[in-house]
């Protein structure tokens, strides 16, 4: 990852785009498919890089920034449930200094001189849920979903042992929130049953719990050993108690399971002592935990602290360090991605780390192999922090056998056998054979039909692979003629292995439904390198319609200077991305394919649907000491109203709020003729907005 301190604005824009796309994909895999693609530590590293970039370049914050979201958009198979109070995730602390910073932020934000009591509890590695009771009767159970809208799992939640269906002496409306999990031994027993029945084993207890809870058939859920803890009261918690410790006492009296392992800390030392106790004893607990949650105990203080886009200010999760294991590197295989990138993968002697059997690990790129001096038959150290695909940290050179084998970077593509062109300095190695490469063609089709692109449900990885292998599709266009081909064929798809009449009918219905698509989705679906959802939206906004888009892209092929300059001037489209766009449309087959798709699809013109307010997208700078509110509280209010708060004044600044002893920033704002107001005017402004 690049050094944030040295990065240019153009590089930052590109990196923010890439991070938004990556994190969105990882969120979808984790929250919706229950199938994590990267380790917790890798995810946290990406997310923190995104935050640091946004802090340095606040004017570059994207509409689809990961810092504004939690979870992922829910799937379509369950009814939707809107949370009255968003179910947000927690910010992370990775060491004692991060925790001290969290405590200091509370003191500064609330202008406290003394330590405010912090409630500490284990962070259960399970699936978050909400349960709503009306007149004491359980009426709705829901998953977190994207934090704002979850999935209705009422029937499934009722099958969990000891989960109250009816409670007495509670308000007319009650919400509880908590975590559903599977204990370690139950997980091992469940996987043994899966294996005996010839079914796939679950990767870890969290996946097993999530998969069990998200069953359409609640009788399957009833057979799974699910357990739960409640830890908050959602929209109604402050009607029940005035603090977190009082709330849990009340919920326990109502018959809910609460985690008895907790601590009300009155100092930082007590916080760290509880953390060390749990870290030391985590392996002895019957369930998996991946850290400790700290939250302000006093609800009135929580209210004053409020929230940022994806997490509360009054709480944080102190993560445990990764679990380290050692195993043997058996071989290195190579995967070819959608844009031709070759990625090495370590095939390992299976090892159990933290209750999960691991047999593969990503190596990211070929320089990583050389840098760590990895050789086949080496004994390697693995890091796992909630991982499914963990990270190789290094080699145990003391145990290196005499017969190890070095890995040679391939000279030819492992999929199409075309020659690879690269230099020893290249970090990324790509196959340039495009759609003539079977692996790239397969991945491009997978991307085209994916949720955030054409959204063709029923065309998952296995189905696409099957249709290609059988010769039923070979490119994007073939998808829309699949029904016609099936109708005229003697070998019907519904009679083939893995298919049935209903699944085929649904597939054809979903393909037909996908023919109505927005311009941003269509552009994203094309799979142009570095054109993620945000850049696709930029292009759609610029060109407005499909006809104009394709016409302008054809002009780009003729080296038309006006269109080149127009693209270059788009915020977010730098030189490198522009080269990727040109390379894509330089391929005649790509233009022809897009034109044919344009004849089949109804590609809707771009429409700006975002609601605007007086402060939306305005860049605001606070300077000096504000008389009645803290700087942090003022910043939080501005961001809540859609403004972007910057640390310095520039020609892009829209508004400066000046307090007492405002210095150089105020002077610069006057020089640039930027609007300046005081705290009283600011409070009036936000009240009117």
UniProtKB/Swiss-Prot annotation:
Respond yes or no to whether keyword DNA repair is given for this record.
Answer: yes
Superkingdom as given in the UniProt entry: Bacteria
Describe its function.
DNA ligase that catalyzes the formation of phosphodiester linkages between 5'-phosphoryl and 3'-hydroxyl groups in double-stranded DNA using NAD as a coenzyme and as the energy source for the reaction. It is essential for DNA replication and repair of damaged DNA.
> Biological process GO terms, please?
DNA repair; DNA replication
Q: Which lineage ranks, top first, belong to the organism behind this chain?
A: Bacteria, Pseudomonadati, Pseudomonadota, Alphaproteobacteria, Rickettsiales
Q: What is this protein called?
A: DNA ligase
**Residue sites binding NAD(+) per the record:** 40-44, 89-90, 121, 144, 179, 295, 319
Domain BRCT positions: 610-689
NCBIfam families according to UniProt = dnlj, PRK07956.1
Question: What family does the Swiss-Prot or TrEMBL record give for this protein?
Answer: Belongs to the NAD-dependent DNA ligase family. LigA subfamily.
